[in-house]
Amino acid sequence: MNAPSTATELSPARQPDVPVDRRQRQALVVGALTPLLPAHALLWQREDTVPYECDGLTAYRELPLAVALPETEAQLAAVLAACHRLGVPVVARGAGTGLSGGATPHAQGVTLSLAKFNRIVRVDPVSRTAVVQSGVRNAAISEAAARHGLYYAPDPSSKIACTIGGNVAENSGGMHCLKYGLTIHNVLRVRGYTVEGEAVEFGSEALDAAGL
């Protein structure tokens, strides 16, 4: 005997009414994000967003509706959550040195700059590990580790300017990757946020951890 079954009609989750017109959509986004960020941490005027229209892949350019520059994780999470509620795409950006278009803005979205997350939390010479925020420059990690006779191996040609967050996103390498591997082989733990603004962590700082 077959178990009874019921066919039901499924409706898509209701999305907020977001205007299609760019100016109206921009006004809605700016209105939602302004209370979440400090003054001057939200850019939407054309002259302010032009510097963010592309990354190192300059053949493709697009102006975002706005550029958010949060300073704390709470602000970052709030921006992501607000954009998610509005159904607005978010593109994260480090230093914009990538050549694969990973930071190319979405014309109907928000560019989320991580430039202000530029703190080196600690360097542990005993375990030979460092905890840094995503906006720290690649070269700055080696500079901080140099006093302990150490350095961070993945060294893309843009290491003076590129950030570790961008390196993780692009799995950057460099001349030392033949011996020490790519970024993925040198990162033990990553803390990030989902599009809903929820914090997530992957990996562990334990030296015997499998890594990422």
Identify what each model region corresponds to:
Residues M1-A81, G98-R128, S157, Y180:
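N-terminal flexible segment immediately upstream of the FAD-binding catalytic core
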Residues H84-L86, R93-A95, C162, N186:
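Short, basic and Ser/Thr-rich N-terminal targeting/leader segments
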Residues V88-P89, Y151:
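Residue-level detector of anion-binding/catalytic polar loops
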Residues R119-L212:
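FAD-binding subdomain of flavoenzyme oxidoreductases
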